[in-house]
Amino acid sequence: RDSLLRAEAISFDKDSILRALDFVAFNDTTFLIPDYSGDSRFCWVNRQGKFLKKSGVIPSLNEEALKEARPALAQAWRSFIDYNPHNGVLVAATQLGEVLEIYNLQNGFHRVCLGPKGEPEFKLAGGYAIPDGIMGFSDVQVTNEAIYAVFHGHTFKEIMAQHQKEGRATDGGQYIYVFNLQGEPLCKYTLDRYITGFHVDERNKTITATDVNNDQPLSLIHISEP
């Protein structure tokens, strides 16, 4: 069997980085990390883990939470992110609700795409965000031509009901949404399985996906042109 050996470990500045649940490499010297303090949208750090700056804001319409409960709001807005250095497009897809944020770091373009399920919903308890509403996205990839995102769409009530009835709930999303680099919808793929993560190969028109509900978790999915 092949072994995965750690080449390097980077410790982030604990005084500036609240927690790091996802990251992307901006270039050879800089990483972007979602900011879970609620003060901004992203933290920038160097290869040594030193904090450089913050940028962006949480694009929520919940003015009360923005004023009084920003850390909890940031928890609810936890997002999966991806960045393509060739076109400069950075995308954040929310784990709750249905929000896609698009930033072009080369030309300054910024757009917030709000889907029918709306922004993340949560209940405040002891300063923490308790998820409500729906499970949203679980992965996102920015290719040279498009944005792909795995979408779930199940409400937490549906998830709990299935868990009570069957002893477990199906994990993952059955849909892959495809947008152009400006956030305009191109198409939606409905899969015959539920996936959590994926990698898109546009050249060969395939998607390698992970299905955690299956004993054979890796799947190869053939796709058509968006």
Which functions belong to the PLM regions below?
Residues 219-226:
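Residue-level detector of conserved catalytic or cofactor/ligand-binding positions
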Residues 37-40, 97-99, 154-157, 213-216:
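Short glycine/acidic-enriched loop and turn motifs that connect beta-strands
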Residues 2-16, 52-73, 110-131, 193:
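Surface-exposed loop and turn segments in beta-propeller and other repeat-based domains
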Residues 2, 46-48, 104-107, 180-182:
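Short loop/turn segments that connect beta-strands within beta-propeller blades
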Residues 28-35, 88-94, 145-154, 205-211:
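Short beta-strand elements that form the blades of beta-propeller/WD-repeat-like
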Residues 21-27, 73-86, 134-143, 199-201:
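Structural signature of eukaryotic scaffold interfaces centered on beta-propeller domains
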Residues 44-46, 166-182:
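Beta-propeller blade signature
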